[in-house]
Amino acid sequence: MGLRGLLCVCLVSLLALQAVAAQGSPTRNPKGGKKRMAVDAAVDGVVIRSLKVNCKVTSRFAHYIITSQVVNSADTAKEVSFNVEIPKTAFISDFAITADENAFTGDIKDKVTAWKQYRKAAISGENAGLVRASGRTMEQFSIHIIVGPRSKATFRLTYEEVLRRKLMQYDIVIKVKPQQLVQHFEIDVDIFEPQGIRKLDVEASFLPKELAAQLIKKSFSGKKGHVLFRPTVSQQQTCPTCSTTLLNGDFKVTYDVNRDDACDLLVANNYFAHFFAPQNLKKLNKNVVFVIDISSSMEGQKLKQTKEALHKILGDMRPGDYFDLVLFGSAVQSWKGSLVQASPANLEAARNFVQQFSLAGATNLNGGLLRGIEILNKAQQSLPELSNHASILIMLTDGEPTEGVMDRTQILKNVRDGIKGRFPLYNLGFGHDVDLNFLEVMSLENNGRVQRIYEDHDATQQLQGFYEQVANPLLRDVELLYPREAVSDLTQHRHKQYYEGSEIMVAGRIADHKLSSFKADVRAHGEGQEFMTTCLVDKEEMKKLLRERGHMLENHVERLWAYLTIQELLAKRMKLEGQEKANVSAKALQMSLAYQFVTPLTSMTVRGMTDQDGLEPIIDKPLDDYLPLEMVGPRKTFMLQASQPAPTHSSLDIKKLPDQVTGVDTDPHFLIHVPQKEDTLCFNINEEPGVVLSLVQDPDTGFSVNGQLIGNEAGSPGKHEGTYFGRLGIANPATDFQLEVTPQNITLNPGSGGPVFSWRDQAFLRQNEVLVTINRKRNLVVSVEDGGTFEVVLHRVWRGSAVRQDFLGFYVLDSHRMSARTHGLLGQFFHPFDYKVSNLHPGSDPTKTDATMVVKNRRLTVTRGLQKDYRKDPRHGAEVTCWFIHNNGDGLIDGIHTDYIVPDIF
C-alpha cells in the first residue's frame, strides 16, 4: 500500500520524544501477581518496535540521529505519528521515512521556492506542513502518516548543534516521551574531546536515582566518554502488570573537559576551531545597573517574582562590586542615581528599596535605559578606580514602550549613542507580550544578548539563573588574533567580556594550506593586569589526534564553522536593512543550502510523499518570537502555522505601505483615496453605539465586511462622546469563511465553534481562498484569492488618550480584483469615479478652505481638512490631507447613511 501524508496541525508545545499511534489509547492489562509480567505493548494494533537516539559529540559539535520503527499488526490501515522534541539551537539536516520498501527523503531548498509550491496548494485549505511548535528550549517536529495493514514504517531524523558551555558544563538534553512501551528502546551517547573529559554525569528526570544508577551505563576515560540507556520492556513498566511506561521526561547528559591550557586549537581539513576558557583567574569586580520595568502590566506574580529574584541577586553581590537600581514606569526613578559599593549596609538598603517600590503606569523604556547608561558612563568617567571594572547593564521589561520616546528606531539609536560599545546590554523579556525581536536587535547592537523569561512558577529561578551566567566576569575586551594572511571567514573573535563557567568559541577557514603549524594569540584585560597567551597546534599532531576519533564525525570542524557562521549571519541580518540585509541573507541562505541545514531561510520538503491533494510535507525552522498556538476545529478545513511567513501579497511590511489610504478609523472617519485625482476624500458617520454598518459588500462573490459601533466609554448608555468600531465581521460565504474581530479576540468561524486567538498571538491561517495573518498586538491582514486585501488595526487605550476603551480601524490595501458591483460605505469607491473641485474660498473657519465639489451630478460644499492614517502608528497616526464632505457623506455616498445599517455583522 502506498504512503500518504496526513494533515498535521500539532501546535501545542509538548516536551516529548514520541513515536505513537495516533488512534486509540493504552490498554491496561492487570493480571495480578508480584512479578513483572508480559503485557501487550500495542496501541490499537500499532506497536513501536524500536526507538533509538544516537548522539555523537566531537569537540562540542553534536550530531543526533533519531530512528523509530512502527509496526501495524492490524488487518486495516492505521494512522501513526512521529513526534520528537529537539533543541531550539539545533538545525535539522536530514529526514527520511521508509515504508513498504519505499524510501521518502528530505530535500532542502530556499524557503521562497518551497513556499511558492506550498502556498499554491495550500489555498485549498489543506496542510502539507510538518508543523513545529516552540517550548522554552525545544521545538516540536511532528508528522502523521498512514501505515498499511501488516506493514511497518521507519522514521529517521538527523539534527546537529554546537554545545555551548554554561555554568561550568555542556548539556545534552534528550526529551523522552514514547507514551507506550517500546520493544527496543535505546539512548546511546558517544563523546570525543581532544582536551580530555574531566567529568561526565547523567540525569533521567523520570527515574528515581537508585533505578537510574542500575539502568544507565556511563563511563569516561581520557578523551572519550560513553552513556548507554537500554531498558527492557519490563524495566519501562510503571508497575509489574501495567502497560504504561515510566519513560516520560528529560534525559540529560552533562560533561566538561580538562583545562590544562588556557585555550585549545583544533585543525582539520583546512578549517580550525578555537576554544578559549582559561581557569584560575581572579574575578573582576563589576559595575552593574539593573533597569526594571514597573509599569502596570507587571502587576501581580511578575512583580513578586522580580522582587524575589532581585533579593537573591543582591545577596550574591561581592564586596568589590558597585551597583544601582533604575525603575521605569510612566516616569523614571533611580535608587541612588550613581553607583555605590556592595557593602552590607548598601545591600540592606537596596533590599528595602526593592521591597517597597510599587507599580507606576506606562512603560518609559527609553528613559529607563538612558538613565542606566548615564549612571555607568558617569562612574567610569568620574571614578578612575571603577574604569577597570567590568560594566554590565541588565534591563527587564514585560511590554513595549508606551511613554516618552516610543519610536523603536529612535530608541535603538539613543541606546547605541549612549553606550558606544563601552559595555554589554542584556535584555530580559518577561512573558510573551514583549517585542523580543526589538530587544534582541538592541542587545546585539550593544554586545549583549536577549533572553525570554517565561511567565511561570519558576520565573524567579529563571532570572537568577541568567544573572549567574554573568555574575563573575574574569576578563574584559577579549580579542582572539590569528595570522592575517593565513585565515579567512572568521566567526566573532572580539568579546566585551569573558565570564566564569562559559567558553569563547571561534572558527574559520585556513587559507594557507601549506602551514605546518597554526597559532592563535589572545589579548584581554584581567584583574589588575593585562592577559596575554598564545595557543599553538602542530598539524601532524592534530592528524594523529583526530585518528583517535574512530567512528566519530569526520568533517565536524567544518560543520562547526558553518553552524557558527550561519547563526551569526542570521543575528546580523536582524540589525540591517535594505541591500545590506539582502546581502547578509543571501550569504546565510547560500551556506544553509551548501551544508543542508534547515534554518529560517530554508525549508525541507519530503520527496515523493504527498497527501490526497499532492502536497509534499514541509519542514521549517520556527522563530522564537512566534508563539505556539493550539489549533481547534477540523484540521481539513484550515491550516494554522505560526512558523511560516505570509505570502508576499498579503505580508504587511509597515515600512512599505503606500501613502494613499482608503479605510475607516477612530470616530468613525472614512478616508477614500482617489488615485486618478491623486487626492483623498473624507467623511464621518454619526450613529449610536450598537449600530452595524455595511463597509464592503460584493454581491458577485458574497464577500462582506460589516462593523459594529461602540461608545467611547463602556457602561455609559446615553452618554455620547463619539463612536468607534468595536466589532468587525468579515465573511466569504463561497468558502464558508467567517472572521469575527474585536479588540480582545479574533474568532475563526464563530458560528461553528472555530478557534479563538488573542491579539497576543502571532499566527497565519488559511481557509480555502482566504488567508489571514495575525501580527501580534498590532494588526491583522485578510487576503482573498482573486479578491481584496484588507487590514484591521488594533487600537489600545494608552495613558493620555481621549478614548477610554480599545477599538479597531479597517483599511483597504488592495481592491482591484473586487467586482464592479461591490458596494458599502467603502466598497462603492473601489472603482474609478470622477469629481471636480472649484471656487476655493475661506470657510466659516478662517483657518480652513472651503470649495465647491461636483460629484455624481450633485453640487456640494466641502472643506479642506486633515484626518489620520493609523496603519504605521496606531497611537499617533500620520496626517492625511483630504476634502471633507459634511452631513454623513451626503451627496458623496449613494443614498443616505442609514441605508447602510444592517442587522448584524454576518
Curated annotation (Swiss-Prot):
Glycosylation sites: C55, N583, S643, T648, N745
Pfam families (alphabetical): ITI_HC_C, VIT, VWA
Residue stretches spanning the membrane: none
Aspartate 1-(chondroitin 4-sulfate)-ester: residues carrying this PTM: D667
SMART domains membership: VIT, VWA
Sequence positions bearing Phosphoserine: S124
Localisation: Secreted
UniProt xrefs under InterPro entries: ITI_HC_C, ITIH, VIT, VWF_A, vWFA_dom_sf
Processing after translation: Heavy chains are linked to bikunin via chondroitin 4-sulfate esterified to the alpha-carboxyl of the C-terminal aspartate after propeptide cleavage.
Residue positions where Phosphothreonine is found in the record: T397, T402
Residues in VWFA domain copies: 287-470
Gene Ontology cellular-component annotations: extracellular region
Cited PROSITE patterns: VIT, VWFA
Signal peptide: 1-22
Record flagged with keyword Phosphoprotein: yes
Function text: May act as a carrier of hyaluronan in serum or as a binding protein between hyaluronan and other matrix protein, including those on cell surfaces in tissues to regulate the localization, synthesis and degradation of hyaluronan which are essential to cells undergoing biological processes.
Protein name (Swiss-Prot/TrEMBL): Inter-alpha-trypsin inhibitor heavy chain H1
